[in-house]
Structures are given as structure tokens and as C-alpha cells.
Amino acid sequence: MANAKEIRTKIASVQNTQKITSAMEMVAASKMRKVQDNMAATRPYAENMRKVISHVASGSLEYKHPYLEEREAKRVAYIIISSDRGLCGGLNSNLFKRALTDMRQWQEKNVEVDLTLIGSKAISFFHRFGNVIAQTSGLGDKPKLEDLLGAVTAMLEHFDDGKIDRLYLVYNEFVNTMVQNPRITQLLPHPDKDESQDSKPNDATSRWDYIYEPDPKDILNALMLRYIESQVYQGTVESIACEQAARMVAMKSATDNAGDIINDLQLVYNKARQSAITQELSEIVAGAQAV
């Protein structure tokens, strides 16, 4: 058993760590509320853009946009969004496992994989996987669309040139403070059925015809670009909200665990102190009897 002094030193060390994790928990909680507000403000736009594109894709089009045309997958690409910092539990590792599983399915079919990485953790993990076309990090808690345009544009150029035939978005979807789901959605070509919609095949609203003015090509070109930008931006905002929620939960767990360790060490310290006092008393009594 360690002596009382060593135990006191360890208790003080754990208490200092507990103060740090408690402070980080409060900071993460404060940031989470702010990023949740940002996420809630942008989510309706992203969802409505997805619905509009789904309706357009299912309608009778005068002009068939290349982003809506299915083609044989010879090479696929992923935009993977992670956090810039750690200490957020298994948030990033769960996302990376999901992405790797999906990537391996394509590789087993002899389909090459390209990557665009957003976030320092994704960059450090995936730099040895596949061909990295673009990467960016350091977006902060309130990212700007301009910071993402370079990565998005690089992927769209590859799709336009026929260098890739599928484009997927990989990110963490914010459900609530305790639940964050790793998600993979197909961006290009836009799937015939929107993954987020539970529309019935015979629904009268599932197929709409549009009249485009002045020109369907110009309108669809602009609309499809805004659609891709909105989905990538929303995925980034969702991932940031997930990061802060996961960090808050992880730091709370660490703080609670530190408290349990301190209690256990306090019991060990009390036993060690009791043993030392008992030994001293025994020595005093033995000395008195000898006299």
C-alpha cells in the first residue's frame, strides 16, 4: 500500500484534472447551444433545397442536367467531414469506420475512390487512404460557405470532367445531445428517391412538371450548384454541433469518473492514515511497557 503522502499527491492530481474536465464541459455546453441555433437556422433551407431537387428530378424535364443523370460507377468520391479537435468520445472514429466500410464495398468491385477531407481529424486519418483531391480545416464553430467552396468546386469539376461518377457526403447527423449518427448520403448524381423522404410512389405530389423561365439550363445549373453547397454546408454545421455535444458528454463522464477515483483514493488514504496511527500507538505502548 502506498504511503499517505503519495496518496495525497495523487488525489490532488486527480482533483486538478477534474477541474479541467469540468471547465471543458461547461465551455462545450455553451458552444453547443450557439451552434445548435446556427444549425436550426440553416436546416430548413437545406431540407427544402433537397425537396425541390427531388421534385425536379422526378418531373418531366425539358433539359436533363448532368447531375441528375445516372451513369456507370467507375470511380467514386467522398466528402468526409470531421471535427478539428479531439476529446469528443467516439464521434470521429465511428464516422471513419462507417466511411471505410462503404469505401471497401466499392474497392471490392475494383472501383477507385477519391476523397475530399474537411476537418483536421479526417485529414490526419485518411491521408493514407485513396486519392485526396482537396482538404480544408480550421473552420471554427461558425463556418463560412466561402471556406468550403474550394473543396466543393474541386469535386464538381472532377464530376463534370467525368473523372468521378458518384459523389457522397459523409458527416455526423445531430439527433439530440446524446445521439449523433454517422451518415452517408449520395449527392451526385441525385438519387431518384430522396433518402430523407418517405413519399409514396403513387403520391400525386411526387411528380411535378415545371415551366422554366427564361431558360431551364441556366436555372438548373444555378439550382444544382446551390443544392450541393447547401448540403455540404449543412453537413458541416451538423458535424460541429455533434462535436460540441459529444465533447460535453465526454467531459461530463470524465468529471464523474474523476470524482469516483477521488472517493476511492480518499478511502485508501484514510485506511493508510489509520494504519499509520495504529502502528504509532502500538510502538508507544510497547515502549511504555518496556520502561
Curated annotation (Swiss-Prot):
CDD domains recorded: F1-ATPase_gamma
Top-level lineage group: Bacteria
Coiled-coil ranges (or none): none
Family annotation (SUPFAM superfamilies): ATP synthase (F1-ATPase), gamma subunit (SSF52943)
GO BP field: proton motive force-driven plasma membrane ATP synthesis
Database matches in PROSITE patterns: ATPASE_GAMMA
Extent of Basic and acidic residues compositional bias: 190-201
Region Disordered, residue ranges: 187-208
Bridged cysteine pairs (disulfide): none
Molecular function, one GO term: proton-transporting ATP synthase activity, rotational mechanism
Keywords: ATP synthesis, Cell inner membrane, Cell membrane, CF(1), Hydrogen ion transport, Ion transport, Membrane, Transport
Membrane-topology descriptor: Peripheral membrane protein
Compartment(s) where it occurs, according to its Swiss-Prot or TrEMBL record: Cell inner membrane
GO CC aspect terms: plasma membrane; proton-transporting ATP synthase complex
Function: Produces ATP from ADP in the presence of a proton gradient across the membrane. The gamma chain is believed to be important in regulating ATPase activity and the flow of protons through the CF(0) complex.
Xref: HAMAP family: ATP_synth_gamma_bact (MF_00815)
Subunit and interaction comment: F-type ATPases have 2 components, CF(1) - the catalytic core - and CF(0) - the membrane proton channel. CF(1) has five subunits: alpha(3), beta(3), gamma(1), delta(1), epsilon(1). CF(0) has three main subunits: a, b and c.
Similarity section: Belongs to the ATPase gamma chain family.
Protein name: ATP synthase gamma chain 2
Species per Swiss-Prot/TrEMBL record: Photobacterium profundum (strain SS9)
Gene for this chain: atpG2
